[in-house]
Structure formats: C-alpha cells, structure tokens
Amino acid sequence: MKTSEAEDQVLNYLVGKCEGRKPSCYTGIVRATAHPDFPDSPPIFGPELNYLTDWALAGPIIEREKLGVWWATHYVDDDGVEYGNHWYAEPGCTDDNADKPYSVAFGPTPLIAAMRCYVASKLGDEVKVPKEILDEN
C-alpha cells in the first residue's frame, strides 16, 4: 500500500509500528501493547490510540521528528502531479536524517499529513499492512 493513501486504522497501525508498539486488531479497534520503554504499562485501546485526531499523541512525534506542517494552496511534485488545498508535511533537515529519503505528504488534516510524512520517513513510500488491519479499515 502507498503510504500516501494510508488512512484511518491503517495509518494508526503504521504510526504505532513506527513508535515501537506491537498493534493487533480486534473488532475494528487497534489494540496496542505497552510501549517498549514502559513494559509494565497497560495496553492502550481504540480511541485513546488515535494519532490522527489526538494532538497529545501526535504532537510529540511532530516535535521530536521536526516535521514541518502547513496549508498548501498549490504544490507540484517532482512527477508533475499538482496538489491544492491540502495540509502538507515534510521532515525538517537535521543531521539525523540527512542521508534518509526525503518524504513529503499531504492530508485533509494537519495530523494526517504529518503522520503520513512520519511513516514514509521511517518505512518508505510503500508499506505492507496485515490483511486483518486492511479488512477492518
């Protein structure tokens, strides 16, 4: 699947994967095991694990990864594809990511654009998603 097309539970799953969580799917809700840094913490369920709407979860990722997010009224990518009236996100230029692929992303909200950018910067422009996660999306 293209990272640029990931949404809903699929995008939440991918962000959780990048964050080191081991998500699994139960009746349409992404259930994540405890964060690897805090193995004794309880699992997080569904609505609490929504990087696409919860600034308290996504904000620290945006800050840590130095993602730039803004409203784009017009943008043409390297392939000549035009985008307009979408949120746009790109990674900040740091010594940590200087030799990594440069991934920009778009989305209908700032958090969706930022999380797509984050996933693309960690996993690439194409990702594999378990069938059970795709089926629940």
Functional labels for PLM-detected ranges:
Residues M1-N137:
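Glycine-rich anion-binding surface patch
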